[in-house]
């Protein structure tokens, strides 16, 4: 097995209704390989898979439900086994909340508590709390989510488990051609087909917006300058608000007919404009699809 001190594993457990789903989504946003409801008896096998992954699973978050006493025997054994391995140090994140808060959440979602499927949720909560006493005592971090909104819980997890780089709000700016379809992962789409098209100038037809002659042509028009002024003003206004709402990244797509000239030029411009303030990735989805045709 490989020795790798960079492997991180977080076991997420705690009271049902305390926010495990939000927690797993938060770890997923941080680039963790996430598995929900992993039976504790499978944990040793999963650890072996991590060891053999050659770095492909160097950050893992596992959501584990402990709804039967027999599960604890498997979990304690697996955790004791982990303590003997130098290449991985597990962290246990225990999510808790007040009984009254958990009851309210179950009423709002109209779901039954897993330990009281036909009874009152409070009975199930009390039973689960008793089962999880030792688990809570062994946890590295206990988070009380009673007064936390989902966005606030996510912010806490990001603060606790991410590096400064991982906390950075990422902006992806891409060009595309409408004839090939709008990118399905785009958050914001801008249509620049109203701008003069270099495609109809014969010697520019095989070029792209990455070529200086094309970009200079597109950027020389007054309407281009006015549009870029309004676009950068709008994006600069919106980005801090998206970040405040808890988004980890935003995809901005700029499209022209074929994704060769106008959209490429403006995508490059916007990317350079945003880079001093944000972590920006610029890409051109369709730039090779009909180049030279």
Swiss-Prot record:
- Name the positions where GTP binds: 65-68
Which residues, if any, are the signal sequence?
A: none
List keywords of the entry alphabetically. ATP-binding, GTP-binding, Nucleotide-binding
Mind telling me which InterPro entries this protein's record contains?
Answer: P-loop_NTPase, RapZ-like, RapZ-like_N, RapZ_C
SUPFAM superfamilies, sorted: P-loop containing nucleoside triphosphate hydrolases
Name the residues that bind ATP: 14-21
Q: Which GO terms describe its molecular function?
A: ATP binding; GTP binding
Q: NCBIfam families annotated for this entry? A: PRK05416.1
Q: Record's HAMAP family?
A: RapZ_like
In the record, the note on similarity to other proteins reads: Belongs to the RapZ-like family.
Function text: Displays ATPase and GTPase activities.
Official protein name in the record:
Nucleotide-binding protein BcerKBAB4_4948
Which organism is this protein's natural source? Answer: Bacillus mycoides (strain KBAB4) (Bacillus weihenstephanensis)
